[in-house]
Each structure stands twice: as structure tokens, then as C-alpha cells.
């Protein structure tokens, strides 16, 4: 079918075609190799923005540190990190004046959270720097390793299960003269492979104990590992992101809880809400500015961009904010919240894997780890890398760079939003005391500023005042990248506003298509994505119908399940034809079994099994959904499952879809090749956790599952539960006397073993 693309736009207002200009089709770019160069860029840039600050030396680690706070006021438009403490505190005071009691209430809410949060909160999240192994690990493993090592050193407060008690352990660990850790090491040996009779290198992982002195431990506790941010669209250069360790994570969580609670009460904050709720918030601010500007005033909107938001923020400023926000609160609470910014003021950025070199004729390859960069001869490097290394050398300690100023990406999104909103708050007429006034929206580093004034000069004056106020708080509005329009047309966090929000449909494109989980989930996710886009993103009925047809086609090609009466030959077509011929009611066959598609845009909300149930042959029903059929997935499937869909920007978000357990909801097995790598020890740990958790769930089925109260360990809880259950079963005659005696004996044996250990 030939379509002339210009015809598509004849009836479309230009602003609705915005989505065709977004770089969202095709695969996003991924980074390869090491992030060392990007991390060095970040460290060097951050120091450059604050270069006129004061240098000091950290007494514990000996790391040189740059403090730009209350530094010189800017003389030009170059980005700088010289925030002024008194200005930040005053902005906070004005924010509180406009919202009486906001800080007080948020502190009370947070205090409650602090006392109730459990350690397992820290298992959420992806990669975490594991300080015991000096590399990244999944969050749950890193937490377990940390707690294991703490226990080895006599720090056991975290066994209560409360996060706040784990943080007490962290604080105490910093005072210890030495920490004993369990770390992994690799042994390589050459062995002859039985099958191929060739010599192969076999790696084994062993565990060994090692002692860290106070300085080494503190350096590790303050270290953020860095990786390259993947899949960023519309950018030529990659950039580095930070993965903090377990010591920092818990403290950051509480600070962000407080900041989130404040953001929820601020109408100018684009966080923590999202989607339609965020659009409603935005529309309210715009409406307010438009109605007030009626005939007498002009109203203009800046689509704002800040230069290097993270690299000019400063943890010391966040400490000042927290000190102010919590000023009437109990001492313990203030201490807990001030630790995160203090740790960030003393942070070390790990430079990642280092550089890979290969000789001209590609014969030799060698890895130069980051630890060696401080001493290696620089003639091997090209000019740009040489400059980077020279610049960063004075800051290096053990392969990590001292990085006191700057925040690293994604750490204090909520708190930095509070800082941004405090400037927007200063735009009220009673504060500006002039003819112009402003309001706007802030979401992390993204902002939209609406300025009202009687004439153009007033607008200009308002923008200038906003710009200068930002500078005083360490925020640098980019004059090159921000642009101004009559209010009614602007962009904020990729929402395009033109007298109402324009659907930016291209952003959703990556989530269309077959996810590749399994036949059952993929069908469900595919139709749910289409349904959601009809609700939220102006996907019209005709386009939705077409999307559905394309999806079904894609699905059939992916799983080779073309209709039973098709001519297409695939690996599965023989089986599918056989099933088709022996089925009486062909409409009842699932698409993945070669059946017809019964979906249209009216019934997308119904899972396919339910949609076709009445049409199925009874023996087909019996095979498809019979719990005794070994191929029906026996995972306890909730009625709602979560899939991860990739929107075009921001983190992968989870989307709910209906799940019906059938023979098609299989779960693929783990790839075995991991068993031969250095990760094997970790895998064994993970399997051990899995087994323990499964066992625990057998004793405490979810219906009766209350969090164990008191400080009993998992084993103690299970033993006492086993005794109670056995007694009940024995007294009601469900088990014989011999069985009861046997169970009691096993329980006693377990307790004896625990005592001996």
C-alpha cells in the first residue's frame, strides 16, 4: 500500500505532528566498553564549575575536597556551583511562609515512616555497589553481603529487621578501627575437557577473609560506583550514572521520603506524580496564570533548560535545607536525615573498569584497571584522555576520585525539586513587590516558567530576576537552550502544551509489539498497551484497530502460530494443522494455537482465554487450563501480573495486565553458561536465599503471614511454627503418634545445631 506521507498531515494542526520528530523508533543506542572516560568527564566538569571554591583535606581519608559554597557571585553567564547558604535558607523560609506547617507535617509523616520501614526496603532497586566485593551486584545480594559482614564484626542491630537499626550498624561500623570482610577471589587452572579433549581454563570462585583498616573501610563506604547510562535517545554522547553502596542507600531513602512528602503538598512540583495527574497539575498552573492575565497583562512561558543540574547542585546545600526543614524536630531524627548529605559531601566516585588497550596488529589486548591510572605513563593515551587523567590525578585514591561538589545523576530528585520550587514560590506579587510576577513547574532539573507583566519590559525584568535568583541557589538556567513563547505553547517533561496537552504518541512506540515473556503474557500485554493508549494518548479507533492487526501479525510471526488454515509453512504448522482439523469449534482456539483473532477495540480488556472460553471444545478447555496438566505453569499466578514496558524516556515502568494460567504461561529456564563464570558463587548465594525464602513461605503461607514480631531469627520462627502445627495435627488425629515424635525430634536437633554453631 503506497501512502504519500504529506497527505497524512493535510488536516493535522502542526503542533499535533510534534511526535513525528522524536527519535523513538528503532533500537535505542547502548554503550559498550567502560564508563571510565564518562566518569572522568563528570568529575572534571564538576570541579571546573566550582573551581573558585576552597580546597580542604578530609581528615579520615586524606582525600582533597573542593567546597564552592558561598563562593564568588557570578560575573558572566557561565554555569557555576556557588550557592549562597543564606539565600537558600531564606528561600526555604519563604516557602514555609506560603505553605504554613508544610515542613512540620512532612517531618511527622516521615518520622512515622522511619520507625516502620524494614530493611528489606533496600532490596528494591537494581544494581548496587557491593563494597565487600568492590563491584556491582543486585541490591538484594549486596544487602545480604553487607549484613553478613556486619554480623562478622559484631554489629547485629539490623537483626530486628528495622531499617533504622541497620543504619545504626552503619554508623557504628564507621567508628571501628578495622573491619573484617568476606570477599571472593578467583582461581584459574588449566584442565583437559573430557568431551573435546582440549585444554580449557577453569575458573573457580573461593571466599576468603580480609581485614580493612578504618581508612580503607570509610573510603569504600563513601564510594559510588559508576556505569554508563544506556538507551538514551537523541544524544550523541553517553554519560555516567552512579550506583551508590548500601551504607548510603538507607539514608538517602529517608531524605527522599521527607522531600517526597513536601513535594506532594506543592502545586508547582511535577514529582512524585506522573501521567494524567501531572498533566492536571500543569493545566491548573497555566489556567491560574491565564485567568489572572486576562486583558491588562501579557503572559509568557519559558520552556526551561538548566545547564548541568546535578553537577552544580551541592550536598552541603542540601544539608542546610534539611537543617532548616527539621529545625524543631527531635535530635535523633535530625541526625538520621543529615547523614546522607554529609556522606555525599565526602563521596568518592569509582572510575569503573578502566581502559582497554590493544596493539596495532590486534594480537595483544590488555586492561588497565582504574587503580593504575594514578601511576601509569601517559604516553600510551591519546590527547583527550591524557588531559582527563592529568586533571583527575590529584583527586585519585585507590581507583576512586574524590568528588565533594555535585550530586551524580538521580540521587536527590525530590529534594532538588523542593529547591527549584522554592524559587518559583518567590514569584508571587507580594514577594516581587513590582508589576511583574511569575509561577511555574519544576520536576527535578526540568522546569517551565510562566511570567506575567503589563508590558514586554516587565516580562524581561521578571525573567532576569528569576535567572539571578537561580544563580544564588546554584541553579544555572541555560540562556541558549531555554526559549520563550506566549503562554499557551510550551513543553515540560516531554509533555507538549498547546492550549491543552498534545498527545506525544511517538513516546509510546517502543512499548508496542511482542514483549517476549511467553505466549500468554505477550498477548495480554500487547492488547493492554493498545487499550491504555486509547485511554491516555489519543490513539483513535481506526489507528487502534490497525495497531491491533499489526500486533496480531507480529505475534503470529514471533511464535510461528499462523492460523490452522493458512498456507504459511513454519516449524509449528504441522502440529497446528493437526489441532485445527480435530477441533470442532475452531473459533475457540487461542491465537497461539493457530486460532482466529477475536479481539477488536471493544473487548481489549478481556483476557483471551475468557473471551473464547464459551467457544472452546471441552477437551481443549481441559488441556489448556487443567492444573493437573504438567505444562500449566504452577507459579501461583496473581489475577494481575506486572510487565515491564519501556517508555521512551524515564525508567522502565511496570504495567499491569490480566494473567490467566494456561499451558502457554511457561517460564524459560536460566541460561546455564553463567555456571562456568566468576559469577557462580553469587548464583549459589542467590539459590540459597531462594531456598530459604521458599521454605519460610511453606511454614507461613501468605494467608497467615504476619511479619514475625520480636527478634526471633527465621529458623527459630519456623521451628516454633512447626511445633505448634504438629501438635494441632496430632491432637486432631491428622498425624500418627510416631510422626509427631519424629517432628519434635527433628526440631530439637535443629536447635542443638544452632547452639553449637
From Swiss-Prot:
UniProt motif Nuclear localization signal: location: 187-195, 203-216
Any GO molecular function: RNA-directed RNA polymerase activity
EC number assigned by the record: 2.7.7.48
Spans annotated as Promoter-binding site: 249-256
Region (Disordered): 52-78
Subcellular location(s) of the protein: Host nucleus; Host cytoplasm
Post-translational events: Phosphorylated by host PRKCA.
Pfam families the record matches: Flu_PB1
GO biological process: DNA-templated transcription; symbiont-mediated suppression of host gene expression; symbiont-mediated suppression of host mRNA transcription via inhibition of RNA polymerase II activity; viral RNA genome replication; viral transcription
Comp. bias intervals (Polar residues): 55-64
Classification via InterPro entries: RNA-dir_pol_NSvirus, RNA_pol_PB1_influenza
Family: Belongs to the influenza viruses polymerase PB1 family.
UniProt function note: RNA-dependent RNA polymerase which is responsible for replication and transcription of virus RNA segments. The transcription of viral mRNAs occurs by a unique mechanism called cap-snatching. 5' methylated caps of cellular mRNAs are cleaved after 10-13 nucleotides by PA. In turn, these short capped RNAs are used as primers by PB1 for transcription of viral mRNAs. During virus replication, PB1 initiates RNA synthesis and copy vRNA into complementary RNA (cRNA) which in turn serves as a template for the production of more vRNAs.
Name used for this protein in its record: RNA-directed RNA polymerase catalytic subunit
Species: Influenza A virus (strain A/Swine/Wisconsin/1/1961 H1N1)
Encoding gene, per UniProt annotation: PB1
Amino acid at each position: 500500500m503506497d501512502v504519500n506521507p504529506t497527505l497524512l498531515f493535510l488536516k493535522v494542526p502542526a503542533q499535533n505532528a510534534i511526535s513525528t520528530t522524536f527519535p523513538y523508533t528503532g533500537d535505542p543506542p547502548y554503550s559498550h566498553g567502560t564508563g571510565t572516560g564518562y566518569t572522568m568527564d563528570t568529575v572534571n566538569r564538576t570541579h571546573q564549575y566550582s573551581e573558585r571554591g576552597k580546597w580542604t583535606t578530609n581528615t579520615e581519608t586524606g582525600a582533597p575536597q573542593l567546597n564552592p559554597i558561598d563562593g564568588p557571585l557570578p560575573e558572566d553567564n557561565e554555569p557555576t556551583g556557588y550557592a549562597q547558604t543564606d539565600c537558600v535558607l531564606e528561600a526555604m523560609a519563604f516557602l514555609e511562609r506560603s505553605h504554613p506547617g508544610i515542613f512540620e507535617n512532612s517531618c511527622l509523616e516521615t518520622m512515622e515512616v522511619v520507625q516502620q520501614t524494614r530493611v528489606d526496603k533496600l532490596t528494591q532497586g537494581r544494581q548496587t555497589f557491593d563494597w565487600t566485593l568492590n563491584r556491582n551486584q543486585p541490591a538484594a545480594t549486596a544487602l545480604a553481603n553487607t549484613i553478613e559482614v556486619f554480623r562478622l564484626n559484631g554489629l547485629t542491630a539490623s537483626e530486628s529487621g528495622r531499617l533504622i537499626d541497620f543504619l545504626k550498624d552503619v554508623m557504628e561500623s564507621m567508628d571501628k578501627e578495622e573491619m573484617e570482610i568476606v570477599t571472593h577471589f578467583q582461581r584459574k587452572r588449566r584442565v583437559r575437557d573430557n568431551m573435546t579433549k582440549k585444554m580449557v581454563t577453569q575458573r573457580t570462585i573461593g571466599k576468603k577473609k580480609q581485614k580493612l583498616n578504618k581508612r580503607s573501610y570509610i573510603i569504600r563506604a563513601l564510594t559510588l560506583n559508576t556505569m554508563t547510562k544506556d538507551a538514551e535517545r537523541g544524544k550523541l554522547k553517553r554519560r555516567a550514572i552512579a550506583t551508590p553502596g548500601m551504607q548510603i542507600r538507607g539514608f538517602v531513602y529517608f531524605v527522599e521520603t521527607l522531600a517526597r512528602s513536601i513535594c506532594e503538598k506543592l502545586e508547582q512540583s511535577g514529582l512524585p506524580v506522573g501521567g494524567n495527574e501531572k498533566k492536571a497539575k500543569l493545566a491548573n498552573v497555566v489556567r491560574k496564570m491565564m485567568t489572572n492575565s486576562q486583558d491588562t497583562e501579557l503572559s509568557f512561558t519559558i520552556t526551561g533548560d538548566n545547564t548541568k543540574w546535578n553537577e552544580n547542585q551541592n550536598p552541603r546545600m542540601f544539608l542546610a535545607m534539611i537543617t532548616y526543614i527539621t529545625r524543631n524536630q527531635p535530635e535523633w531524627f535530625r541526625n538520621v536525615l543529615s547523614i546522607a548529605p554529609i556522606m555525599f559531601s565526602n563521596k568518592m566516585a569509582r572510575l569503573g573498569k578502566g581502559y582497554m588497550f590493544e596493539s596495532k596488529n590486534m594480537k595483544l589486548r590488555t586492561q588497565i584497571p582504574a587503580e593504575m591510572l594514578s601511576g601509569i605513563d601517559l604516553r600510551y593515551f591519546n590527547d583527550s584522555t591524557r588531559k582527563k587523567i592529568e586533571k583527575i590525578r590529584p583527586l585519585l585514591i585507590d581507583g576512586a576520585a574524590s568528588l565533594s561538589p555535585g550530586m551524580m545523576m538521580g540521587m536527590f530528585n525530590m529534594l532538588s525539586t523542593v529547591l527549584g520550587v522554592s524559587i518559583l514560590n518567590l514569584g508571587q506579587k507580594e514577594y516581587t513587590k513590582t508589576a511583574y510576577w511569575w509561577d511555574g513547574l519544576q520536576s527535578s532539573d526540568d522546569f517551565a516558567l510562566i511570567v506575567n507583566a503589563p508590558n514586554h519590559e516587565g516580562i524581561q525584568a521578571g525573567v532576569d530576576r528569576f535567572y539571578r535568583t537561580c544563580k544564588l541557589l546554584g541553579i544555572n538556567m541555560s540562556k541558549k537552550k531555554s526559549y520563550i513563547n506566549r503562554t499557551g505553547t510550551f513543553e515540560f517533561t516531554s509533555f507538549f502544551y498547546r492550549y491543552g496537552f498534545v498527545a506525544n504518541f511517538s513516546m509510546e512506540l517502543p512499548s508496542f509489539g511482542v514483549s517476549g515473556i511467553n505466549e500468554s503474557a505477550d498477548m495480554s500485554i500487547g492488547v493492554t498497551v493498545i487499550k491504555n493508549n486509547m485511554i491516555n494518548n489519543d490513539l483513535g479507533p481506526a489507528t487502534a484497530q490497525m495497531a491491533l492487526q499489526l500486533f496480531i501479525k507480529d505475534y503470529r510471526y514471533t511464535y510461528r502460530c499462523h492460523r490452522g488454515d493458512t498456507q504459511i509453512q513454519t516449524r509449528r504448522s504441522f502440529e497446528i494443522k493437526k489441532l485445527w482439523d480435530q477441533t470442532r469449534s475452531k473459533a475457540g482456539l487461542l491465537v497461539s494455537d493457530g486460532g482466529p483473532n477475536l479481539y477488536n477495540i471493544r473487548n481489549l480488556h478481556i483476557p483471551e482465554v475468557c473471551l473464547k472460553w464459551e467457544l472452546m471444545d471441552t477437551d481443549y478447555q481441559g488441556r489448556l487450563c487443567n492444573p493437573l496438566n504438567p505444562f500449566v505453569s504452577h507459579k501461583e499466578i496473581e489475577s494481575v501480573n506486572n510487565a515491564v514496558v519501556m517508555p521512551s524516556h524515564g525508567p522502565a515502568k511496570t504495567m499491569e495486565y490480566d494473567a490467566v494460567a494456561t499451558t502457554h504461561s511457561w517460564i524459560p529456564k536460566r541460561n546455564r553458561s553463567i555456571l562456568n563464570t566468576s559469577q557462580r558463587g553469587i548464583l549459589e548465594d542467590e539459590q540459597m536465599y531462594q531456598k530459604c525464602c521458599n521454605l519460610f513461605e511453606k511454614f507461613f503461607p501468605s494467608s497467615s503471614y504476619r511479619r514475625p514480631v520480636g527478634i526471633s531469627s527465621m529458623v527459630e520462627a519456623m521451628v516454633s511454627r512447626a511445633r505448634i502445627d504438629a501438635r494441632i495435627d496430632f491432637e486432631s488425629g491428622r498425624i500418627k503418634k510416631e510422626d509427631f515424635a519424629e517432628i519434635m525430634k527433628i526440631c530439637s536437633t535443629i536447635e542443638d545445631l544452632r547452639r553449637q554453631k
